[in-house]
Amino acid sequence: MRKGKRVIKKIEEKIKRQVTFAKRKKSLIKKAYELSVLCDVHLGLIIFSHSNRLYDFCSNSTSMENLIMRYQKEKEGQTTAEHSFHSDQCSDCVKTKESMMREIENLKLNLQLYDGHGLNLLTYDELLSFELHLESSLQHARARKSEFMHQQQQQQTDQKLKGKEKGQGSSWEQLMWQAERQMMTCQRQKDPAPANEGGVPFLRWGTTHRRSSPP
C-alpha cells in the first residue's frame, strides 16, 4: 500500500522537539560540509535555536565574517544596480512624456492654423512653409478626387456594356427562334401532301396524274 505524503508541522512536545533539532542540525551541518568540499563552494550556515542559542558553520576556505561582508557587498551592488536601472527608466519615461507633450502642442497649433487661427504668430518663413504644405495637400486631394471620379466613370461604363451584352443576347435568342420556325415551315412544305377524305392524295405542283376510271 502506498504511503501518503508526510505533513511537516511543528512538534508540540518540547523534549521530542529538542531531540529532533539535535539530529537534524547535525545532519544539516554534515550536508553543508560535504557540499563545500565536493563542489568547492564558499558556504556559511547560521542557526538560532528555539532558545536563541547560536550554531554556525563555515567552509574551511573562508570565514563567517568574510562571507557576511561579501554578502553585504553583493546586496549593495545589486541594490545600486537596480536603483540605477529604475532611475534610467524613470528618466526615459520623463523624456518620452515631454516629447509627446511637445508633439501634442504642435498638433494643436497645426489644427488652429488650418482653421485660420494663429497665423499672426508665424514668421514669414513659417507662413511660406505652411503655404507650401497647403498647396501640396491640395494637389494630393485633387489627384485623389480625379482618381475617384475616373473609377466611378469606369464602373458606369462597365455596367452599360454589361447591359448591352445582355440585350444582344436576348436579340440573338429571338433570331435563333425565328430561324428555327422558318426551317420547320420549309420542312413541312417539302414533306408529301396528306390524303383527302376520299383516300386520294392531292396533286403536287408540276406533276400530272390521272384518276383511273372505275371498271
From Swiss-Prot:
Domain MADS-box: from-to ranges: 1-61
Domain K-box: from-to ranges: 90-178
Cited function: Probable transcription factor involved in the regulation of fruit growth. Contributes to integument development. Controls organ size via cell expansion. Involved in the regulation of longitudinal growth of the fruit evenly throughout the radial axis. Functions redundantly with TT16/AGL32 to repress nucellus growth and promote its degeneration.
Gene Ontology CC: one annotated term: nucleus
Region ranges (Disordered): 143-172, 184-215
Molecular function terms from GO: DNA-binding transcription factor activity; protein dimerization activity; RNA polymerase II transcription regulatory region sequence-specific DNA binding
Quaternary structure annotation from Swiss-Prot or TrEMBL: Forms homodimer. Interacts with AGL16.
Protein name: Agamous-like MADS-box protein AGL63
This protein's record includes keyword Chloroplast: no
Compartment(s): Nucleus
Pfam families on file: K-box, SRF-TF
Other comment: Plants over-expressing AGL63 are dwarf, have few rosette leaves with a curly-leaf phenotype, and display small disorganized floral structures and addition of carpel-like, resulting in small abnormal siliques with few seed production.
Statement: the UniProt record of this protein carries the keyword DNA-binding: yes
Keywords: Developmental protein, DNA-binding, Flowering, Growth regulation, Nucleus, Transcription, Transcription regulation
Gene Ontology biological process terms, A to Z: fruit development; fruit morphogenesis; integument development; negative regulation of cell growth; positive regulation of transcription by RNA polymerase II; regulation of timing of transition from vegetative to reproductive phase
InterPro entries in the record: MADS-box/MEF2_TF (IPR050142), MEF2-like_N (IPR033896), TF_Kbox (IPR002487), TF_MADSbox (IPR002100), TF_MADSbox_sf (IPR036879)
Tissues in which the protein is found: Expressed in bud pedicels, petals, anthers, style, ovary, seeds and embryos.
